[in-house]
A protein has these predicted regions:
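N-terminal accessory segments
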Residues: 1-56
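Pre-Walker A adenine-sensing motif
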Residues: 52-72
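Walker A/P-loop
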Residues: 71-95
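Conserved C-terminal RecA-like helicase domain
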Residues: 79, 83, 137-195, 199-200, ...
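Conserved Walker A/P-loop ATP-binding site and its immediately adjacent core
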Residues: 91, 104-150, 188-189, 418-422
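Conserved ATPase-coupling elements of RecA-like P-loop NTPase cores
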Residues: 121, 192-201, 216, 227-239, ...
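Residues immediately C-terminal
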Residues: 189-190, 228-232, 257-258, 423, ...
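Conserved P-loop NTPase catalytic core
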Residues: 218-221, 236-373, 413, 456-457
Length: 544
């Protein structure tokens, strides 16, 4: 199976053209070091006029309150708001090619919030069909060299070398006019560890002995993906500004951070746009047929358990919980690492991962304050089983329709968010994976039901292959998987993060049925990772 990209879509062209026109008739000095971007005259008055003129176009959909004529400053910041699923990654890739073609910009750093998004971005840029699209369909006479900054394991004795990805990015030369250099980095690597800040490497790059300094010398353009995770008071954003000092930051996202302006009675909270060039919001995206609508089913607990948990007090890294039943109240003082099963067996698998001066953080990502309370009902095994069964039923309803589409069959995926990794992966011996085992039993039962229906030969074969190997139908991705040595786990992670084409195929490379279509995660895939073939999403337990 080969994916195809469509060119000339107006909702994407508007964004690319807007960014490109910002630099129109701005002085750009090309006489710089071979490893550096051309120098943009950020003091040019043309920026103000160009930006304001773009914002006034009706097609850009920029609200009057976000149109401005403020000066640029030391870094030009441009904002593109695009709803999830409308092609942000494609648009910023297209923008990279266009800025290189028009202005010779060839050094871009893409900052993303997570390892999952970093992997997805790298995979997209390296795909053969993507390269062919920009070269053959759009006619760009250039190719992107993709570097991915990875965390390094503790180095043993010996010579200390610059991170390979940093070296390749910095040393990339403008003299090679058909090369564009892109470095992808997740936010944690900008702020943790000493990889980019240390200056005791044995070999320098272009005279620089500190990676951040070497990167700064390239005068990079920085693209920020998911800007709401890079607010101005966040460490990663501060590192981008102070350590990389980019000439230009282009933020692409469906959601932008909030900021407070004004004082006293005039104080208000607004979206933190700097120079918003394009606003493709949810309403416009849906009305234009660019995104799918969502049908939500709220599943009511079926158990008769009438219990609540209330947080009475939080202090000194401990929290006092009260377990309330119809007949009694019992208080327990818990600390980080304790299981809430101490309160009720229905809460097995839910632990405390953090306690601050005013809130308790649970392993499902929920944050609870003093006096907060929640029902125990939604944690019962019967509730989980009912939700799983309904999600599986809904999946097969959609899968049957998509498999027999007149315009060509579509592989249907389902995504399950869970909050207890142990329930899916099991312990070190693979035991106690109760949720995974429950899912397999329910899937097996539903497959047998589907096989009893009238099926086309092709779909019947697909269902039988699924029934013959239930484990092959599912895969999980959790943050802990990045260090898991198990080959089967690595294959699951690769299928979800890297092998998008194979995941969407009905047949694997060996010519056998590819039945993997049920994906499990905690919240690792909650943003940035997207797949148009996900038709069913189930949030198990109370995950916030």
């Amino acid at each position: 199976m080969e994916l195809k990209l469509e060119s000339g879509l107006p909702h994407q062209e508007y964004a690319v053209e807007a960014i490109s026109e910002v630099f129109k008739q701005v002085e750009i000095n090309q006489q710089v070091a071979h490893y550096s971007n051309p120098v943009i005259d950020l003091r040019s008055n043309r920026f103000i006029g160009n930006i304001y003129r773009i914002q006034q176009r009706e097609r850009q959909n920029v609200a009057e309150k976000y149109r401005n004529e403020q000066p640029v400053g030391n870094t030009l910041c441009l904002d593109i708001k695009m709803e999830t699923g409308t092609g942000k990654t494609y648009v910023y890739t297209h923008t990279i090619f266009e800025l290189h073609k028009r202005y010779g910009i060839n050094k871009f750093i893409i900052a993303v919030p997570s390892i999952a998004i970093k992997a997805g971005t790298s995979t997209f840029l390296n795909e053969t069909y993507v390269k062919a699209h920009f070269k053959n369909t759009l006619g760009y006479d250039a190719e992107i060299n993709v570097g991915v900054l990875e965390a390094v394991k503790k180095q043993k004795k010996g010579r200390k070398y610059f991170p390979t990805a940093v070296r390749a990015f910095v040393e990339g030369s403008r003299l090679n006019r058909n090369k564009i250099y892109v470095l992808i980095v997740n936010s944690a690597l900008l702020t943790t560890g000493k990889m980019l800040t240390r200056n005791d490497y044995d070999v320098t790059i272009e005279g620089y002995d500190r990676p951040f300094d070497a990167l700064r010398s390239t005068r990079p353009f920085v693209i920020i993906d998911e800007p709401h995770t890079f607010s101005r008071d966040q460490k990663a954003y501060k590192a981008i500004i102070s350590e990389l000092t980019p000439q230009c930051i282009i933020r692409f996202g469906a959601t932008f951070p909030m900021t407070t302006i004004g004082k006293g009675k005039k104080k208000t909270t607004v979206r933190d746009y700097e120079h918003l060039l394009y606003d493709l919001n949810a309403q416009r995206s849906f009305s234009s047929g660019l995104i799918k609508g969502v049908m939500k089913e709220h599943f009511e607990p079926t158990s008769t358990i009438n219990e609540k948990v209330k947080i009475l007090d939080i202090n000194d890294k401990k929290a006092t919980f009260q377990h309330i039943t119809q007949t009694s109240k019992a208080s327990h003082v818990l600390s980080v690492g304790d299981s809430l099963s101490i309160l009720s067996p229905e809460l097995t698998g839910l632990t405390i991962t953090g306690i601050t001066k005013d809130l308790v953080i649970l392993s499902n990502g929920m944050e609870k304050h003093k006096k907060d309370e929640f029902d125990v009902d939604i944690y019962t095994s019967s509730y989980q089983e009912s939700m799983l069964r309904l999600a599986i039923q809904r999946h097969f309803e959609t899968e049957r329709d998509n498999f027999h589409r007149e315009k060509g069959r579509i592989k249907t995926l389902a995504l399950f968010f869970i909050d207890d990794i142990l329930s899916f992966r099991g312990d070190d011996e693979g035991n106690n994976a109760w949720l995974r085992d429950l899912f397999d039993r329910l899937l097996e039962a539903q497959l047998k039901t589907e096989l009893q229906k009238e099926n086309s030969p092709g779909y019947a074969t697909y269902l039988r292959a699924s029934l013959n190997d239930l484990a092959a139908c599912r895969a999980g991705y959790f943050a802990q998987d990045n260090s898991d040595p198990d080959d089967a786990v690595k294959k699951e992670v690769d299928d979800i993060l890297h092998n998008k084409t194979e995941l969407l195929s009905f047949v694997n490379k060996k010519g056998q049925p590819n039945t993997r279509r049920f994906l499990f995660s905690k919240w690792t895939l909650k943003e940035g990772w997207d797949n148009p073939n996900v038709f069913t999403i189930a949030k198990l337990r109370s995950s916030g």
